[in-house]
Amino acid sequence: MRLFLVCLAALSVVACHAPSSRGAEGGSRAGGALRIATWNLEWLVAPEDFLALARSCVPEGASPGRRRRTIPCDVAAKLERSTADFDALARYARELDADVVALQEVDGPAAARRVFPGYRFCFSTAPAVQNLGFAVRDGLPFRCGRELADLSLGGRLRSGVELVLHPGTAAELRLLSVHLKSGCGRRTLDSPRDACGVLARQVPVLERWIDAQAAAGRPFAVLGDFNRELLRDAGPARNGSGGLRSLWSEIDDADPPEADLANAAEGERFVNCHPGQNFNGYIDHIVLSRGLAARRVPGSFRRVTFEPREALRRNLTDHCPVAVDLATHAGRDD
């Protein structure tokens, strides 16, 4: 089934406050900078929709049959979010204070609006519950771009979603939100693990999008849950037989020149979302084209973490956002 992008306006605005940024790197935003971020919100579904889905959840090992909008029964049992849970997530979103947020694992605008009031949205409208897209601060010029359906490998996985900021001006900027195959966080893509082979099939699709933007001379960024520790993804792109082995080396080839990429987290200290986690590397990334990397505000990378006691009491998410600031384009047409 073909998927379409929708742009929806947020319905309400709430007052903001600026709590301290526990564990976050970077300081306050430089004047006029654009803050872009990415956040996987782990099965974020509006409460009224969650209850309906929970009543017909799919047990472990069972098939959903022809149903496309389903949630697993373990998700139904553990991830029902209260008003207080949504309020806490919205508070962290205000702390993030991003102009644009690439979103993953969000059912759609009804759920996203509870975390990002005062934003507008571009979302894929897949019948599945785990969609992805963007939240865009109200007032920032944008249009919803095309969907990168080939990234779903025939509907098996998730498509990419494109966003165009300042369309038709000298400041036009392309962003792509992605959520790649899990299960191959560190292994080389030519390892025998099935997940690595699936991820390897997504890489050429991603590289084609990157190269198309680079060839057109456009600044761009890819943001999202790569499910891979790109900062440790070193070595040659291909093995001796020509098989793909490194995602990062394959896409960061400077061919065309704008495809000389930078990871916003490079050189930054890794911080878990809360003390109960024991991960040791980023899998949520902001990948910048050469032109955008030159506009990165030094020291602006930040990771908004959760207050430890709140992380234990609330249904938040197993990911927390990362962000970086970009200096205003000199040729910007406001």
Spans of model-derived segments:
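Bacterial N-terminal signal peptides
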Residues: 4-15
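N-terminal, active-site-proximal structural segment of metallo-dependent hydrolase catalytic domains
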Residues: 16-116, 127, 310, 330-334
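Metal-dependent phosphoester-hydrolase catalytic domains
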Residues: 16-26, 207-221, 227-334
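Active-site beta-strand/loop signature of hydrolases that rely on acidic residues for catalysis
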Residues: 36-41, 71-82, 89-112, 163, ...
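Second-shell loop/turn segments in exported
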Residues: 73-80, 92, 97-103, 150-151, ...
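Stable alpha-helical elements in mature extracytoplasmic
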Residues: 85-89, 102, 108-111, 131, ...
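Structured beta-strand-rich core segments of catalytic domains in phosphoester-bond hydrolases
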Residues: 100-181
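Metal-dependent phosphoester/phosphodiester hydrolase catalytic core
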Residues: 168-176, 180-204
